[in-house]
């Protein structure tokens, strides 16, 4: 008992040192426990991947080849370590022949895609910027019709991974997020995604999977990091200071758009059986003696563009890739025009909400479904676009929807969640 009293007396007399020791031990224990949980997640994922690698293949079959485009600079330079610890072991254990190509500077992924050889699957390891560069480089190729059929996997290693929410289960644990995304590539289930082709008058086209933003909310989002010292109030502060500098922040443009296009019926997954020999001979003789009449070529109908002048707080052009499983009658993209009648207080509130999901339209926004759009901007002071969270100089552009252009690997669990949310 005397020893216990002596211990408590020592702790009381040296309470500052005792408090510091408790904080250090608590942090160290939490860090060790987190590392242990991450190791358990990696081990379970590797065991699941090993089951794929142990499957027997025929003597004439060859290993699947995967080309990985890795951006080591993603996630503030941590992407290479995250990939080597959490994704690379899973791919190797699954028996996939992996070729890793690392980028050295911004924009290199576009050039690498021009030189890439045919592969069984393409894996993009990085964030929104890496994904947008690879997709743009892929669809700029002369043989993009062939390469666009290659299934694509996305391993979220960046600071911003917006598309990952549509493909993988959302998790706050970085290790679990990466391992589940890598395993979904091995399982082979895919979903089709729409692509936006954005083309200026002189520039080469840029391609996007999420959308295009132009307006006040986008401009403020680029300055939020300057108010880091305000902690959780930095987003509200950035919008408040912006409203003090200029209000209202109206953006004026001329908008033309085409109506949505009806979605064609899906092709059957199963290839129909080949008819028997006698039936094929009969059809050939019938076509020989009574050849089918050739229909005259139909002249394409002129495009019916609708035009209007817009005055808006922010204009966004979005794909429907947020829920790629949802069945739609028309192939279309969504044009959203935020009302210019917002008060400064509403601007701050809506801007705070948009910092969580930048592509979410605000209440009372005018929404237009279209298959193509032309945006005519003023020659001076147009500002900048955000295309898939990447900054581009704003100019007059034409945006066209390429429906179901690419196929991405998707986890079965996330697909079920999206199907239930319809």
UniProtKB/Swiss-Prot annotation:
An example Gene Ontology CC term for this record: mitochondrial membrane
A matching Pfam family: DAGK_cat
Entry keyword set: ATP-binding, Kinase, Lipid metabolism, Membrane, Mitochondrion, Mitochondrion inner membrane, Nucleotide-binding, Transferase
Subunit-structure text: Component of the TIM22 complex.
Organism: Danio rerio
Top-level taxon of the source organism: Eukaryota
GO BP term, example: sphingosine biosynthetic process
Stored InterPro entries: AGK_C (IPR045579), ATP-NAD_kinase_N (IPR017438), Diacylglycerol_kinase_cat_dom (IPR001206), Lipid_Phosphate_FormReg (IPR050187), NAD/diacylglycerol_kinase_sf (IPR016064)
Matches recorded under SMART domains: DAGKc
Region called Hydrophobic, residue ranges: 18-34
Biological function: Lipid kinase that can phosphorylate both monoacylglycerol and diacylglycerol to form lysophosphatidic acid (LPA) and phosphatidic acid (PA), respectively. Phosphorylates ceramide but not sphingosine. Phosphorylates 1,2-dioleoylglycerol more rapidly than 2,3-dioleoylglycerol. Independently of its lipid kinase activity, acts as a component of the TIM22 complex. The TIM22 complex mediates the import and insertion of multi-pass transmembrane proteins into the mitochondrial inner membrane by forming a twin-pore translocase that uses the membrane potential as the external driving force.
Entry's localization field: Mitochondrion inner membrane; Mitochondrion intermembrane space
Bilayer topology: Peripheral membrane protein
Catalytic function, reaction form: a monoacylglycerol + ATP = a monoacyl-sn-glycero-3-phosphate + ADP + H(+); a 1,2-diacyl-sn-glycerol + ATP = a 1,2-diacyl-sn-glycero-3-phosphate + ADP + H(+); an N-acylsphing-4-enine + ATP = an N-acylsphing-4-enine 1-phosphate + ADP + H(+); 1-(9Z-octadecenoyl)-sn-glycerol + ATP = 1-(9Z-octadecenoyl)-sn-glycero-3-phosphate + ADP + H(+)
Cofactor section: Mg(2+)
Domain DAGKc: 61-202
GO molecular function terms listed in the Swiss-Prot or TrEMBL record: acylglycerol kinase activity; ATP binding; ATP-dependent diacylglycerol kinase activity; ceramide kinase activity; D-erythro-sphingosine kinase activity
EC number assigned by the record: 2.7.1.107, 2.7.1.138, 2.7.1.94
Family in the record: Belongs to the AGK family.
Pathway membership, UniProt: Lipid metabolism; glycerolipid metabolism
Name of the protein in question: Acylglycerol kinase, mitochondrial
Keyword Transport: no
